[in-house]
Amino acid sequence: MLQPKNTKFRKMHKGKNRGLAIGTNVHFGLYGLKAITRGRLKSSQIESARRAITRAIKRQGKIWIRIFPDKPITKKPLEVRMGKGKGNVEYWVALVQPGKILYEISGVSEELSRIAFKLAAAKLPVKTMFVTKLVM
């Protein structure tokens, strides 16, 4: 699972997930998976999508993960009364805005990468689309 090695503070405010994304172009690979809705991706969801891509391309080519879960989400234990402070960190999420490139692939055919990204998109809670690198 992805999570930061160390952070300045253990817990974080809930905050908002507004605005447009940074990192909207395919930069490293030839094909990318772009988010078209906003949401929060858990580290487990990012990892399961990565596994789906790896299995689909049969360990050929190269994969880049362009998102990292850096926001801790806390949860209080079951049947605990309100108050007594904020709960413990339960999992880590990455905030995703529309237009953000989530994964990139190179070294495989476009047809195979479309299949791989379709399998990965089924594991993610945001709507996605397949994009190719713009060659100038």
UniProtKB/Swiss-Prot annotation:
Q: Name one GO biological process term.
A: translation
User: Any idea which GO molecular function terms this record carries?
Assistant: rRNA binding; structural constituent of ribosome; tRNA binding
Q: Which InterPro entries match?
A: Ribosomal_uL16, Ribosomal_uL16_bact-type, Ribosomal_uL16_CS, Ribosomal_uL16_dom, Ribosomal_uL16_sf
The record's Gene3D superfamilies line, in alphabetical order, gives:
Ribosomal protein L10e/L16
**Membrane spanning stretches:** none
Provide a GO CC annotation, any one: cytosolic large ribosomal subunit
Keywords from UniProt, A to Z, are:
Ribonucleoprotein, Ribosomal protein, RNA-binding, rRNA-binding, tRNA-binding
- Summarize subunit and interaction data from the UniProt record for this chain: Part of the 50S ribosomal subunit.
Q: Which family does it belong to?
A: Belongs to the universal ribosomal protein uL16 family.
The record's listing under PANTHER family reads: 50S/60S RIBOSOMAL PROTEIN L16 (PTHR12220), LARGE RIBOSOMAL SUBUNIT PROTEIN UL16M (PTHR12220:SF13)
What is the protein's given name? Large ribosomal subunit protein uL16
Give the lineage.
Answer: Bacteria, Pseudomonadati, Pseudomonadota, Gammaproteobacteria, Enterobacterales
